[in-house]
Amino acid sequence: MKKYKIIMTGGGSAGHVTPNLALVPKLKELGFEIKYIGSKNGIEKEIITKENIPYYSISSGKLRRYFDIKNFTDPFKVLKGVMDASRILSKEKPDVIFSKGGFVTVPVVIAASMKKIPVVSHESDLTPGLANKIASPFCDTLCVTFPESLKYIKDNKGELTGTPIREDLLKGDKERGRKFCNFKENKKVLMIIGGSLGSKVINESVRKILNEILKEYNVIHLCGKGNLDESLKNLDGYRQYEYISEELPDLMALADLVISRAGANTIFELLALRKLNILIPLSANASRGDQVLNANSFEKSGYSMVIKEEELNSELLLKSIKDLEKNREKYLNSMKMSKIGNGVNNIIDIIKKSAHM
């Protein structure tokens, strides 16, 4: 019986890595041998090696929409990355590549195309990111999360699959989460998720009104690397963490209300878990505007309350928390009516088909 092999790739932020992990249990169940290609120093290396998945590093350059002196040197890094990836693919001879986006994926997808290895990519956001845009001519299928995304995909390569959500995230234990946080008072729990890199503006707005928030809530604050505030370390009812992985399902189960960036993976997880949420998308000035589009789509569907980053201040945030609580049932009912499910099985079917399984 043939042993099938898949190489997964994706990196730069946790959002380009964790959806890969959602597919791993099912792939293993089907008998796939799994390897991973990422960058030398990206967050993906730490996340993937923890899962005991063999990891290859390649050179990768960032691709930018704006002028930067590195725009002259980074294409050479991408070229070296294609050569690195090509050597790995020649050695491993995978049946299929699964790419989750991020700049490290571009050399892998190009090398795979040159070697006639089928490539399945996934785009979480409403509009394709720059890496997926560049890589899409070399892909066989581009899976998307939002129905609106299909119009951006050329050559009929688009497939509406939804986003893959880790099964363990849907099976968190509330009491285990409470024990982990060691909250003394039995209040509601407010969780703040600033993304794997953190958000200075969200962190500051929350911390300014902490005393007010703590009257009603215990607070779990995922503030990003290097953003812990030592002066708040011993504050009752407030727990701050740079990044949480293993305990995240339990903390999500514990949360009654979530304030979050609007990365597609996170918002679809909040929808699947039916969590009341306030989205503060990364502004179009600081990004390509993908989070703004994601948040607008969720606001329109009645799943989320949205605050523009440009308008964010502590007073507005406090008012929004109170307004969300007042309208709790309206938002929860909209989420319950959603027909958007976990994309794992849809994506696995496409991977199997591409690998001729």
Swiss-Prot record:
Chief place of localization: membrane
The enzyme's E.C. designation: 2.4.1.227
One Pfam family hit: Glyco_tran_28_C
Subcellular localization, as worded in the UniProt entry: Cell membrane
UniProt pathway annotation: Cell wall biogenesis; peptidoglycan biosynthesis
Any one annotated GO CC term: plasma membrane
Entry keyword set: Cell cycle, Cell division, Cell membrane, Cell shape, Cell wall biogenesis/degradation, Glycosyltransferase, Membrane, Peptidoglycan synthesis, Transferase
Binding-site list for UDP-N-acetyl-alpha-D-glucosamine: 13-15, 166, 196, 291
Highest rank taxon of the organism: Bacteria
Membrane topology: Peripheral membrane protein
Gene3D superfamilies for this protein: Glycogen Phosphorylase B
GO biological process: carbohydrate metabolic process; cell division; cell wall organization; lipid glycosylation; peptidoglycan biosynthetic process; regulation of cell shape
InterPro entries: GlcNAc_MurG, Glyco_trans_28_C, GlycoTrans_28_N
Enzyme class at the top of the EC tree: transferase
Reactions it catalyzes: di-trans,octa-cis-undecaprenyl diphospho-N-acetyl-alpha-D-muramoyl-L-alanyl-D-glutamyl-meso-2,6-diaminopimeloyl-D-alanyl-D-alanine + UDP-N-acetyl-alpha-D-glucosamine = di-trans,octa-cis-undecaprenyl diphospho-[N-acetyl-alpha-D-glucosaminyl-(1->4)]-N-acetyl-alpha-D-muramoyl-L-alanyl-D-glutamyl-meso-2,6-diaminopimeloyl-D-alanyl-D-alanine + UDP + H(+)
GO molecular function: UDP-N-acetyl-D-glucosamine:N-acetylmuramoyl-L-alanyl-D-glutamyl-meso-2,6-diaminopimelyl-D-alanyl-D-alanine-diphosphoundecaprenol 4-beta-N-acetylglucosaminlytransferase activity; undecaprenyldiphospho-muramoylpentapeptide beta-N-acetylglucosaminyltransferase activity
NCBIfam families: murG (TIGR01133), PRK12446.1 (NF009102)
Chain's role: Cell wall formation. Catalyzes the transfer of a GlcNAc subunit on undecaprenyl-pyrophosphoryl-MurNAc-pentapeptide (lipid intermediate I) to form undecaprenyl-pyrophosphoryl-MurNAc-(pentapeptide)GlcNAc (lipid intermediate II).
Family membership noted in the UniProt record: Belongs to the glycosyltransferase 28 family. MurG subfamily.
PANTHER family: UDP-N-ACETYLGLUCOSAMINE--N-ACETYLMURAMYL-(PENTAPEPTIDE) PYROPHOSPHORYL-UNDECAPRENOL N-ACETYLGLUCOSAMINE TRANSFERASE (PTHR21015:SF27), UDP-N-ACETYLGLUCOSAMINE--N-ACETYLMURAMYL-(PENTAPEPTIDE) PYROPHOSPHORYL-UNDECAPRENOL N-ACETYLGLUCOSAMINE TRANSFERASE 1 (PTHR21015)
Name recorded for this polypeptide: UDP-N-acetylglucosamine--N-acetylmuramyl-(pentapeptide) pyrophosphoryl-undecaprenol N-acetylglucosamine transferase
Source organism of the structure: Clostridium perfringens (strain 13 / Type A)
Gene transcribed to yield this protein: murG
